[in-house]
């Protein structure tokens, strides 16, 4: 009798995706982040569901409902901080996952890559709306500042902002709809993840060399299930260390003050994982220009397949582009630091230089270095 996992209509889908899936034999730990992102999404949906049972999306009670969760609900503090810090872990894994894709040329799987970009945008939208829900000072002012950016759109901007707000300012209508969207989006993300995997399994995984690995495939289980399990344990260790010892390390103290429309905090800034994009936004003096640069800072990922000039897929054997890649990584850290600093000298000029180099490295220097490397190898025509 044939094994049920190979014949049952539902189980065989899981079998082809996680058990008998042919995987390259040489994929490194950089390939662990896909499964870790799946784990993060599950943690966020489960903790979020339990938080939603006790949360009220009303401006008068939102802040106190979060306080109630932390003080009165059994292990409410644990659920709340797992959810808040789980978002940080989610973005750490996301950035490393995207960085891996850039380094090893995984963006040549166009469908998988484009769904990934949509997933990144959806996750950023979800995280932004989630940050508004506790209705602290930074929640309120963050929502006001970021939604206000849409007013830079010519002609329809102001109308659009008021439509999103549900009034003439961020108020009860805004909070209620943000809660509704924050609840539904993770399930949309989960559906997109399935599509992401569907497209990936059409082509099979990439590997560090960037070469075709059809001649040397191994089954996903037990080799990569056990490898993923190590990553899972490390992620949980890191997350729980953060939650139990440093729960407020990545948060903003201003968010422990209830939202007050009459009192603006001295430095309005988003969560740490948006700071690089926030720095790019602030580095351009023009409002519309800043918004376009902000969107382009993420959307530039969609142009990577067209900017690939090298005859090699991966950066594994491309030392010049490797140097540029790590310069880009360092540049992103500088942008993250600048995004959290006040708008004054010398931070303004550092942010502007870092923004210019961010786009220059991706759009100009990396494509040129790809051509140079091909010439050095006498591969070019």
Curated annotation (Swiss-Prot):
Transmembrane stretches in the record are 33-53, 77-98, 113-133, 178-198, 226-246, 288-308, 320-340, 347-367
Where along this sequence does the record place binding of a ubiquinone?
Answer: 201
Keywords assigned by UniProt? Electron transport, Heme, Iron, Membrane, Metal-binding, Mitochondrion, Mitochondrion inner membrane, Respiratory chain, Transmembrane, Transmembrane helix, Transport, Ubiquinone
A biological process (GO) annotation for this entry? mitochondrial electron transport, ubiquinol to cytochrome c
Cofactor(s) annotated in UniProt: heme b
Query: What Pfam families does the annotation carry?
Result: Cytochrom_B_C (PF00032), Cytochrome_B (PF00033)
Q: How does it sit in the membrane?
A: Multi-pass membrane protein
Compartment(s) of residence: Mitochondrion inner membrane
Organism superkingdom = Eukaryota
Residues the entry annotates as binding heme b b566: 97, 196
Cell inner membrane as a keyword of this entry, yes or no, is: no
Name the GO cellular-component terms: mitochondrial inner membrane; respiratory chain complex III
Q: What does this protein do?
A: Component of the ubiquinol-cytochrome c reductase complex (complex III or cytochrome b-c1 complex) that is part of the mitochondrial respiratory chain. The b-c1 complex mediates electron transfer from ubiquinol to cytochrome c. Contributes to the generation of a proton gradient across the mitochondrial membrane that is then used for ATP synthesis.
Q: What else is known?
A: Heme 1 (or BL or b562) is low-potential and absorbs at about 562 nm, and heme 2 (or BH or b566) is high-potential and absorbs at about 566 nm.
Task: Describe, as the record does, how this protein assembles with itself and its partners.
Answer: The cytochrome bc1 complex contains 11 subunits: 3 respiratory subunits (MT-CYB, CYC1 and UQCRFS1), 2 core proteins (UQCRC1 and UQCRC2) and 6 low-molecular weight proteins (UQCRH/QCR6, UQCRB/QCR7, UQCRQ/QCR8, UQCR10/QCR9, UQCR11/QCR10 and a cleavage product of UQCRFS1). This cytochrome bc1 complex then forms a dimer.
What is the name listed in the Swiss-Prot or TrEMBL entry for this protein?
A: Cytochrome b
What is the species listed in this Swiss-Prot or TrEMBL entry?
A: Apomys datae (Luzon montane forest mouse)
Q: What's the source species' lineage? A: Eukaryota, Metazoa, Chordata, Craniata, Vertebrata
């Amino acid at each position: 009798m044939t094994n049920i996992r190979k014949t049952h209509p539902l189980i065989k889908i899981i079998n082809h995706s996680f058990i008998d899936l042919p995987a390259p034999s040489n994929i490194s730990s950089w390939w662990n982040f896909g499964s870790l992102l799946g784990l993060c999404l599950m943690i966020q949906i489960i903790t979020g569901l339990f938080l939603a049972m006790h949360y009220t999306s009303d401006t008068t009670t939102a802040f106190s409902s979060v306080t109630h969760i932390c003080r009165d609900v059994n292990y409410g503090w644990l659920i709340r901080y797992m959810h808040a810090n789980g978002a940080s872990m989610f973005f750490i894994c996301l950035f490393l996952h995207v960085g891996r894709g850039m380094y090893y040329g995984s963006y040549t799987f166009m469908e998988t890559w484009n769904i990934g970009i949509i997933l990144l945008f959806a996750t950023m939208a979800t995280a932004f709306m989630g940050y508004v829900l506790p209705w602290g000072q930074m929640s309120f002012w963050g929502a006001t500042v970021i939604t206000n950016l849409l007013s830079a759109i010519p002609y329809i901007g102001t109308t659009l902002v008021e439509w999103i707000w549900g009034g003439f300012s961020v108020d009860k209508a805004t909070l209620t709809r943000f809660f509704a969207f924050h609840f539904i989006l993770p399930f949309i993300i989960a559906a997109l993840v399935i599509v992401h995997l569907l497209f990936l399994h059409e082509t099979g995984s990439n590997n560090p060399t960037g070469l075709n690995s059809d001649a040397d495939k191994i089954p996903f289980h037990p080799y990569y299930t056990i490898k993923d399990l190590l990553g899972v344990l490390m992620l949980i260790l890191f997350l729980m260390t953060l939650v139990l010892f440093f729960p407020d390390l990545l948060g903003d103290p201003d968010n422990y003050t209830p939202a007050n429309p009459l009192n603006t905090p001295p430095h309005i800034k988003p969560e740490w994982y948006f700071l690089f994009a926030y720095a790019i936004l602030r580095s351009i003096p023009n409002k519309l220009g800043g918004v376009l640069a902000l969107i382009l800072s993420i959307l530039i990922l969609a142009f990577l397949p067209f900017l690939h000039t090298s005859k090699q897929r991966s950066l594994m054997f491309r030392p010049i582009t490797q140097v540029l890649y790590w310069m880009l990584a360092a540049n992103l850290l500088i942008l993250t630091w600048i995004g959290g600093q006040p708008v004054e000298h010398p931070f303004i000029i550092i942010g502007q230089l870092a923004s210019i180099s961010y786009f220059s490295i991706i759009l100009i220097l990396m494509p040129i270095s790809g051509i140079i490397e091909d010439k050095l190898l006498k591969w070019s025509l």
